[in-house]
Regions:
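Conserved N-terminal entry element of GNAT/NAT acetyltransferase domains
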Residues: 1-14, 18-28, 134, 145-169
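Conserved active-site tyrosine of GNAT-family acetyltransferases
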Residues: 124-128, 283-284, 288
Length: 302
């Protein structure tokens, strides 16, 4: 049978692509695809444009998914996932992304696409350059890994601070406050029911474990640092996302402690390494090393 392209159908394709990413994961993320927890986190994130999910492209052969072209949060970005034997679909997948995943600029109303291509895929890099894409280094996304040591290093906190998790202390108002302030959205934190529900959906994704969602509580009980951690049992790895510290509590080692505690708990479950899609100093200090960069290329289509 021939390879067929069709539109994404939610929620069935959420599950099937989830399984696709797990099945084709190679140790050390050598496959270059998104790791499964990133796909899960995408669907719980409050910034996701869920109204456009149907525009995601799914390629099948004999009823098996062999490739996916998708965005992460909003139209205007494209990521590409492959069965290892179907990388010859690159050109067709880029065609699909330009037709269906393009965004429209706020200034001038021009159609554009940011295509994210791993720097260890020379064939795809050559393709996007030949089709008029230009590098946009500010959009590059590093993938980094941390080989979990044995014994695990001691985790220290300033006096009066403590580590906890959403399994032990699930307070969505505290979580929302820590993330809102931690991501520098301002001092006035909206606390309506819709905001708190969006945080619950963000962290209560299908395979999420509340015991891996780690918070640092200040002496007054408020959450002042937070690390959402995922464990993927088939690949035996942890994924760190998101991490934030309230501005007044930065440079105290709190974010680092939350990250390490999440990884430590994943190690107890069987993880031998952890991934994060960032190369910020906090991760470098812990010992994360770059695996590859997902290079950002931009093209204006109109």
């Amino acid at each position: 049978m021939s390879i067929k392209l069709r539109h994404y159908i939610h929620p069935d394709d959420y599950r099937r692509i989830d399984e696709f990413l797990i099945r084709h994961y190679q140790p050390g993320n050598a496959d270059g695809n998104w790791i499964e927890p990133a796909w899960e986190y995408m669907h719980g994130h409050p910034y996701l444009d869920s109204t456009s999910l149907r525009k995601i492209g799914v390629w099948e052969e004999n009823g098996e998914i062999v490739a996916v072209s998708h965005y992460e949060s909003q139209l205007g970005e494209a990521f590409f996932e492959f069965h290892p034997a179907y990388r010859h679909l690159r050109d067709e997948m880029l065609d699909h992304a330009e037709r269906h995943l393009a965004g429209v600029s706020k200034e001038g109303g021009r159609k554009y696409l940011h295509a994210f291509i791993n720097d260890n895929d020379p064939g795809f890099l050559s393709l996007v350059k030949s089709r008029g894409y230009e590098e946009d280094p500010e959009g590059d996304r590093p993938m980094c890994r941390f080989d979990i040591p044995e014994p695990f290093p001691a985790i220290t906190l300033p006096e009066g601070f403590r580590l906890t998790s959403l399994a032990e202390e699930c307070d969505w108002a505290k979580v929302h406050h820590a993330l809102w302030r931690g991501f520098d959205h301002g001092e006035d934190v909206p606390m309506d029911e819709a905001e708190l529900e969006s945080r619950r959906r963000m962290f209560d994704t299908p395979k999420a474990r509340r015991d891996l969602k780690i918070a640092v509580a200040a002496p007054d009980g408020d959450f002042v640092a937070f690390c959402g951690t995922f464990y993927e049992p088939a690949g035996k790895f942890a994924y760190v996302e998101p991490v934030a510290t309230v501005p007044a509590y930065r440079r105290m080692g709190l974010g680092k402690a939350a990250v390490l505690e999440g990884i430590r708990r994943c190690a107890e479950l069987g993880a031998s390494l952890a991934y994060v899609g960032n190369d910020l100093p906090i991760y470098q200090v812990i010992g994360f090393k770059r695996v590859y960069d997902s290079k950002c290329f931009v093209k204006y289509l109109t």
